[in-house]
């Protein structure tokens, strides 16, 4: 998969972004101070002397098509009493929430710089009510400009920004050198910006929440939205201030409205409707560190709870920043669930991605560098990271899945625990990574997330090794799964577990494996199960409170391992036979020394209703019963055993996968089953039944049977005995020429299935849910037994030969009504035999005395029947005249003459043969007289008819 974020196209970006000029960001002031005029005059003189062609800031429009330098403009001078430096990686992540009503007129926002350092005197620049002082050397720091903030850029420039007290419009004038001019603040390419708008605050929970649709029409500052992807310097912790102060004072009538300004990658400035605090990522790396017990260095980041505006710089790891929830507000605050809906903009590699999701979208990038906090014995220096990049995949139901990855890789592997605070109860997600082959024992720090207060939940130690996979979970009615993760988790180090109350040094000192740490290792699987149950309950409660968005899904946890060098990826992985089920088991044998030669079983879960997302979870070290094998994607620990996979519907494919010895056994079992059915079909008069030997020939373990590959099914040969041959021979090859069954509801276990009735297995049939095969031998035997109980001759051949003669007859006879027994569904006609007296057919034409009609179809006889109808009409008159002469009196007189002749011969004791001859002669004489009389009558009638006609 291409994880580069540079070639991503924008999604759901249908509205064009507005372009603003520089005049839109200036405060609407009616007067211009003398200091402004003086600085502008100095700037014009300096430009003319130096030969630089710089446009006036008032006329410097950004709407021109050519690309201009990245200029940082400080718009408003409002002081925020907070200190501490935070860091952010390159490849900035821009978050923009939209969906609210656009402002009626252009509004000016205040971008506040929170980092406070000691400034130095230099030439100053005042734009609006903000004074900026620039100096190239930070050596001479004086206390005269104590109200300025120093910012150092990559190119060596030092920028001083003046800030005033929050909530006031007063500005502190800074006296600058007359020779100083206006210096353009050019942002280097490495400095990125992250702007949160529409009621967005920073939190230490490690999650990014998009605003949920609010019931109110206006958004109030203080709505909580959290961001993950930031880590403190040197693996430190981000602490929120515990003091409770008012959030933001209500603006006075003279105070102008505020807007949010975002600079895009192509140099354009975008004005965004902003009612909440903003975040500017363009600051210096923090220098102040605090020493924790055990020699671990950490950077303490303190944020003011009053506004929630933060300045971030480039980090070595992840920084978790959170502003405390305001306690007292003049304008009021709402919960995060009532924020206005919008979109989240993720920028990576110069392109923008718009994610349309009204619910929660959570990004969880892994830190690409380690810090000295976790490695207390190795003494390694923290390595720098190249930054983050984001990729986005389309999901089901309009959800866009965003995945943030880091660019570089780190060789040192650590084991850490990410704390995720909940509103109901404490949650822990354990991320497992193998220790690096550097001799440094891996450490594991478990941090609990308390739900009582945000300050208690904002402490997390997140210095982790490099992985190209991330852990995502669901909360609030939407989940962001991993796209196609197929990695295996190596076994965690023995005893690498500690409590949240222990310091980092205590957690590092407890990383040495020993025999006394077997008990914590046995309880890890139980802890994982408890975490899954808790997360499921929390996610279900959170999904109930959401107003819009896609249907909530159950959370999935993905635990992956780092992908370092090629040597680490050389562990043998063996997959079982392909299965159609949703869960696949993969057995991996680890070569690491900490595995203790025990096998680990992985579950490969692929939900069918999702968008193809795949999950894999490892269980190792703890045996489980079979009752919890398939519970939430877990399987028990089995030593040197694998479960038999379910059968595959194409049986020939399965037969090809069998070994030679299994194929021979399969064929022998099939032959026995067929022979058993044939034995039941033999006549009861057979005195010597065939014995079927249940024993199969066995071979030594080392010898393999060289059996050539045969088809899955074969036609049985007739038995050796004459009686059995007589019973099977009447089929006349019907088995080979029969048509395939097409059963859909009977599972091929009823007698109207030709395959089942003939005692054969279904082969190349179009039946559904077929049980007439060796895979369901138990069900098939049960159906055969029930049929024989009802009808002992159920499986006997329908067409048998009589004791004498060669004619074959049907045992039951056909029951045709309309076809005249000339269609193939007539069993007698299909077997090439005439219908007998047993048949109950109506209008039968399949008779022995008519060979011309026997094998012809009824359609070919339609023309013959038409000709016969014409002849029948001509003969109808003659038949009516015959009835005139053969009356009841004539027939009775003829019979009386024959009887009188018999009585006379009996009195004379004449032989029987002579008596029969005399009787027949008497009947012949009677018929001769009748015919002669009829001829006379016919001639008379013809003469009578000819006379009137003439």
UniProtKB/Swiss-Prot annotation:
One GO term (biological process): spermatogenesis
Low complexity composition-biased segments: 366-386, 500-516, 535-548, 661-682
Disulfide topology: none
Transcription is among the record's keywords: yes
UniProt-annotated location(s): Nucleus
Keyword terms, alphabetized: Activator, Cell cycle, DNA-binding, Nucleus, Repressor, Transcription, Transcription regulation
Region called Disordered, residue ranges: 1-63, 366-387, 500-523, 533-552, 638-702
Gene Ontology molecular functions: DNA binding
Biased composition (Acidic residues): 10-26, 40-55
Main location: nucleus
Biased composition regions of type Basic and acidic residues, renumbered to the chain: 29-39
GO (cellular component) term, any one: Myb complex
Keyword Translocase attached: no
Superkingdom as given in the UniProt entry: Eukaryota
Domain CRC: 737-849
Complex formation: Component of the DREAM complex at least composed of Myb, Caf1-55, mip40, mip120, mip130, E2f2, Dp, Rbf, Rbf2, lin-52, HDAC1/Rpd3 and l(3)mbt.
Entries under PANTHER family matching the protein: PROTEIN LIN-54 HOMOLOG, TESMIN/TSO1-RELATED
Functional description taken from the UniProt entry: Component of the DREAM complex, a multiprotein complex that can both act as a transcription activator or repressor depending on the context. In follicle cells, the complex plays a central role in the site-specific DNA replication at the chorion loci. During development, the complex represses transcription of developmentally controlled E2F target genes.
Family from the record: Belongs to the lin-54 family.
Name of this chain's protein: Protein lin-54 homolog
Source organism: Drosophila melanogaster
């Amino acid at each position: 998969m291409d994880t580069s974020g540079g070639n991503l196209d924008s999604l759901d970006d249908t509205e064009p972004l507005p372009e603003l000029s520089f005049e839109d960001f200036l405060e609407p002031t009616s007067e211009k101070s003398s200091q402004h005029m003086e600085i502008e005059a100095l700037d014009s003189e300096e430009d003319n002397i130096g030969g630089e062609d710089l446009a006036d800031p008032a006329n410097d429009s950004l709407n021109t098509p050519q690309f201009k330098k990245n200029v940082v403009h400080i718009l408003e001078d409002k002081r925020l009493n907070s200190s501490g430096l935070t860091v952010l990686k390159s490849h900035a992540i821009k978050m923009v929430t939209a969906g609210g009503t656009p402002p009626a007129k252009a509004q000016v926002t205040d971008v506040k710089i929170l980092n406070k350092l000691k400034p130095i005197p230099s030439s100053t620049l005042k734009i609006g009510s903000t004074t900026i002082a620039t100096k190239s050397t930070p050596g001479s720091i004086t206390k005269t400009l104590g109200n300025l903030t120093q910012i150092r850029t990559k190119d060596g420039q030092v920028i001083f920004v003046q800030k005033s007290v929050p909530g006031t419009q007063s500005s502190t004038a800074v006296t600058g050198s007359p020779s100083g001019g206006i210096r353009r603040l050019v942002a280097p390419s490495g400095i990125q910006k992250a702007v949160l708008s529409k009621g967005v605050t920073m939190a230490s929970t490690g999650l990014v929440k998009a605003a949920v649709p609010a019931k109110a029409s206006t958004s109030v500052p203080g709505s909580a939205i959290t961001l993950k992807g930031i880590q403190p310097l040197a693996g430190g912790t981000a602490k929120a201030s515990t003091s409770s102060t008012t959030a933001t004072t209500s603006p006075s009538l003279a105070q102008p409205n505020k807007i949010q300004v975002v600079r895009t990658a192509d140099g354009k400035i975008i004005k965004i409707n902003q009612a909440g605090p903003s975040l500017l990522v363009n600051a210096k790396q923090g220098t102040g560190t605090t020493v924790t017990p055990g020699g671990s260095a950490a950077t303490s980041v303190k944020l003011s709870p009053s506004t929630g505006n933060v300045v971030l710089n480039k980090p070595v790891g992840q920084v978790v920043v959170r502003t405390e929830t305001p306690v007292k507000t003049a304008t009021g605050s709402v919960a995060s669930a009532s924020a206005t809906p919008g979109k989240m903009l993720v920028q990576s590699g110069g392109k923008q991605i718009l994610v349309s999701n009204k619910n929660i979208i959570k990004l969880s990038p892994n830190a690409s560098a380690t810090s000295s906090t976790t490695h207390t014995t190795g003494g390694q220096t923290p390595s720098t990271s190249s930054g983050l990049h984001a990729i986005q995949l389309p999901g089901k139901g309009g959800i866009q899945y965003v995945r943030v990855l880091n660019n570089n890789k780190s060789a040192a592997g650590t084991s850490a625990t990410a704390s995720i605070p909940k509103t109901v109860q404490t949650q822990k997600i354990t991320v497992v990574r193998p220790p690096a082959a550097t001799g440094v024992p891996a450490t594991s720090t478990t941090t609990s997330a308390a739900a009582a207060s945000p300050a208690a939940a904002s402490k997390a130690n997140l210095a982790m090794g490099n992985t190209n996979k991330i852990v995502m979970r669901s909360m609030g009615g939407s989940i962001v799964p991993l796209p196609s993760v197929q990695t295996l988790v190596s076994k965690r180090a023995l005893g690498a577990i500690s409590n949240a109350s222990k310091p980092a040094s205590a957690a590092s000192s407890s990383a040495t494996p020993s025999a006394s740490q077997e008990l914590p290792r046995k309880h890890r699987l139980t802890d994982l199960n408890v975490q899954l149950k808790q997360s499921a309950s929390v996610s279900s409660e959170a999904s109930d409170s959401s107003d819009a968005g896609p249907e909530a899904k159950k959370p999935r946890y993905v635990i992956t391992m780092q992908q370092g060098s090629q040597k680490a990826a050389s562990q043998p992985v063996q997959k079982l036979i392909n299965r159609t089920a949703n869960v696949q088991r993969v057995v991996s044998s680890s070569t690491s020394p900490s595995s203790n030669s025990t096998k680990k079983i992985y579950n490969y879960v692929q939900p069918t209703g999702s968008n193809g997302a795949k999950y894999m979870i490892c269980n190792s070290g703890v045996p489980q019963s079979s009752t919890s094998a398939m519970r939430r994607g877990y399987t028990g620990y089995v030593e040197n055993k694998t479960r038999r996979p379910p059968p595959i519907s194409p049986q020939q494919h399965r037969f090809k996968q069998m070994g030679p010895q299994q194929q021979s056994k399969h064929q022998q079992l099939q032959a026995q089953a067929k022979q058993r059915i044939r034995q039941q079909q033999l006549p009861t008069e057979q005195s010597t039944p065939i014995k079927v030997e249940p024993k199969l020939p066995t071979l030594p373990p080392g010898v393999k049977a060289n059996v050539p590959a045969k088809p899955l099914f074969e036609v049985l040969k007739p038995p050796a005995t004459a009686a059995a041959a007589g019973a099977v021979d009447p089929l006349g090859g019907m088995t080979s020429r029969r048509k395939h069954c097409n059963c859909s509801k009977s599972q091929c276990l009823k007698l109207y299935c030709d395959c089942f009735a003939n005692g054969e297995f279904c082969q190349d049939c179009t039946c559904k849910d077929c049980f007439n095969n060796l895979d369901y031998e138990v069900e098939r035997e049960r159906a055969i037994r029930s049929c024989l109980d009802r009808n002992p001759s159920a499986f006997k051949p329908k067409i048998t030969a009589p004791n004498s003669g060669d004619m074959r007859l049907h045992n039951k006879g056909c029951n045709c009504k309309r076809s005249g027994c000339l269609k193939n569904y007539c069993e007698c006609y299909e077997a090439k035999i005439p219908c007998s007296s047993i048949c109950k057919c109506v209008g039968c034409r399949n008779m022995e005395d008519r060979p011309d009609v026997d094998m012809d179809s009824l359609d070919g006889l339609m023309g013959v029947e038409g000709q016969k109808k014409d002849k029948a009409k001509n003969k109808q008159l003659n038949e009516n005249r015959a009835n005139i002469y053969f009356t009841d009196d004539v027939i009775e007189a003829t019979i009386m003459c024959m009887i009188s002749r018999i009585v006379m011969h009996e009195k004379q004791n004449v032989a029987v043969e002579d008596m029969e001859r005399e009787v027949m002669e008497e009947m012949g004489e009677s018929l001769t007289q009748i015919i002669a009389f009829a001829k006379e009558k016919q001639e008379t009638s013809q003469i009578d008819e000819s006379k009137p006609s003439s």
